[in-house]
A protein has these predicted regions:
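Short, structured segments at the rim of ligand-binding sites
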Residues: 1-417
């Protein structure tokens, strides 16, 4: 457990966040498939390290623990490893996270995949083969990682791949990020309407392609929350003005609703989070976060701390993340004095009361619950349970907080006997 005293924010502190987990995980799959890629500033997140380890080992059974991205990307990756049978498994929670839409798409492409326990869920037994089918239909409202998983192997297929997305597209920005990465490596792709086409990669050049991974905008979101509540300047390194990360939307969102201006220093790839003096907060925040659901927890906590009514939609995918994030938010926001209503894809504030005494935030084995609630320490002392969950995406989070806060962050040892 981490106890965060009621704190103040220091001004003009600079933080270096490691590479984007989303980009790093995509690059690791491409590096393994095409080999002529060198990655700089790779994410130091647990998810990325688990994926890297899985790709480097030649074992029949691969356990990726809580790493949902690795589960999805490796399902497609092992599907094209001709002559190799792989059992892909994970943690208890991973076995509760649906993967049927991706498996069905791969089965329709001719891959033999077997559910070893419950229909539609890991663990999976995958028999790799050469894929000759060229088209597949996929529901558009599923996790973008399912679609990305198919896109990452598409350039390796002899005839490429056409993916027809049926229905309304969810998290489009993450799909576009994947296509941008493919294009940078010379894999031709197009996204017109609801159809994505990826051509087979034929330019097997011998020269090494270097890719510098931009820092992680999802991780940056917590510092936007600190800046919004503490009204002090924070600098973050290795961020690009023209980012392909969907969560870079945090810059516009926090400027509009919380008066945090993002100033880019392009030569240094540094951004400054600058609070606007005399900013008038909105009467209510109404926002569709369909394209950036991973930063919704951060925004809800910021709004709750400032007692700004909010209504956030487009959050259907949060139900099947590391935990049911909407239910987790509903439970933990009550401790901050914020009553909410949730549906399958929305969360709405109903009433603001005073925060509870002795606040202890459950994380539900979800890294984003720990980090999104941490900025509330600028309002009131609180404790974050199971603080080590941050290792999934941001192992240095607590150390970086100590650089920007005027307070003590202490570890509480819990006797579990």
């Amino acid at each position: 457990m981490k106890k965060l005293e009621k704190s103040k924010l220091q001004s003009n502190k600079t933080i270096q966040i490691s590479g984007s987990k989303s980009i790093s995980n995509r690059l690791l799959i491409l590096e393994s498939l095409f080999e002529n890629i060198k990655i700089d500033n790779l994410s130091n997140s647990q998810d990325t390290q688990l994926l890297k380890k899985a790709l480097s080992e030649n074992t029949e059974t691969v356990d990726i623990h809580h790493a949902g991205t690795a589960m999805r990307f490796l399902t497609s990756y092992y599907s094209i490893q001709e002559g190799k049978t792989t059992i892909l498994t994970g943690s208890k929670r991973m076995k509760e996270r649906p993967i049927k839409n991706l498996v069905t798409a791969l089965q329709n492409l001719g891959v033999e995949i077997e559910y070893l326990e419950n229909e539609g869920f890991p663990p999976l037994k995958i028999k790799g083969r050469k894929i000759t089918e060229t088209q597949v239909n996929v529901p558009a409202n599923i996790s973008s990682q399912f679609i990305t998983s198919l896109l990452l192997i598409a350039g390796k297929l002899e005839k490429g791949l056409e993916i027809n997305l049926v229905g309304e597209i969810t998290s489009r920005s993450y799909i576009e990020m994947t296509l941008d990465i493919l294009t940078k490596f010379g894999i031709k792709a197009s996204f017109i309407g609801n159809t994505i086409k990826v051509e087979p990669f034929t330019d097997h050049q011998s020269s090494i392609i270097h890719y510098e991974v931009e820092s992680d905008w999802s991780s940056a979101s917590y510092f936007y929350s600190f800046a919004a509540l503490g009204r002090k300047t924070i600098r973050l390194k290795s961020f690009y003005r023209e980012s392909t990360q969907g969560d870079s939307a945090i810059a516009k969102i926090y400027e509009e609703f919380f008066g945090i201006k993002t100033i880019f220093a392009d030569e240094e790839y540094t951004i400054t989070l600058q609070p606007v003096e005399g900013f008038t907060f909105p009467e209510k925040i109404i926002l569709d976060m369909n394209d950036c659901p991973d930063i919704a927890q951060t925004l809800c906590v910021t709004a709750a701390a400032l007692k700004i009514p909010f209504e956030i939609s487009g959050l259907g995918t949060l139900r099947v993340k590391e935990t049911d994030r909407l239910l987790a938010l509903y439970n933990e926001l009550q401790k901050l004095g914020t009553e909410t209503e949730i549906t399958d894809s929305t969360i709405r504030s109903v009433r603001f009361d005073e925060p509870q005494e002795n606040i202890s935030i459950k994380t539900y084995q979800d890294h984003r619950m720990a980090m999104s609630f941490a900025p509330f320490c600028l309002v009131k002392e609180l404790t974050i349970e199971d603080e080590n969950v941050v290792e999934k995406s941001y192992p240095m989070f607590w150390e970086d907080l100590e650089k920007i806060l005027i307070s003590n962050i202490t570890e509480i040892n819990v006797n579990t006997k």
